């Protein structure tokens, strides 16, 4: 039996891919280190970064995550991928990346990641992100996507969040 969350995830990715009219071609991958390094590239390869941007047709950008947040962005001319964990939220990698895009045409897609229902954190992180945390039953949880969603709403940027949790979804365990 196929899990309904898996179907949602595949549908989410297919919607995004069809919007970008992707074809098979070259791939650019990242050695992700929870940094704030954003690179604009034009050829395939392995890069030391947590965000890649390209204008090169048929160059596929790869982002790998477990519980971190994969974000795909495009303004119709450029496309980018971002790997964001709590360190990425702290060092504002999303905002550093979108500075290189035309905000008036920007579209943001947030993929499956640890959601606020399950991403339990300790007091030190709770204090670092007071607007992106919740407390329930004496436990503290981080909402990784909250800052991005808030920004997109304020700037009227089109965004989509898969809302699939990689911690409690059967598709990821």
Over which residues does each language-model region extend?
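Active-site microenvironment for binding and transforming phosphate-containing groups
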Residues: 1-173
């Amino acid at each position: 039996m196929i899990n309904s969350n898996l179907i949602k995830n595949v549908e989410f990715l297919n919607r995004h891919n069809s919007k970008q009219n992707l074809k098979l071609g070259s791939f650019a991958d990242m050695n992700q280190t929870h940094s704030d390094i954003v690179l604009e590239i034009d050829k395939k390869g392995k890069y030391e970064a947590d965000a890649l941007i390209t204008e090169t047709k048929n160059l596929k950008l790869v982002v790998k995550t477990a519980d971190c947040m994969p974000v795909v962005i495009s303004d119709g001319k450029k496309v980018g991928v971002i790997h964001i964990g709590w360190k990425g939220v702290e060092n504002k990698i999303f905002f550093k990346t979108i500075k290189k895009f035309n905000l008036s045409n920007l579209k943001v897609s947030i993929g499956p990641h640890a959601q606020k229902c399950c991403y339990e954190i300790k007091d030190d992180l709770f204090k670092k992100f007071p607007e992106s945390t919740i407390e329930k039953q004496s436990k503290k949880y981080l909402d990784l996507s909250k800052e991005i969603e808030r920004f997109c709403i304020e700037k009227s940027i089109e965004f989509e969040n898969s809302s699939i949790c990689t911690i409690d979804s059967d598709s990821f365990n």
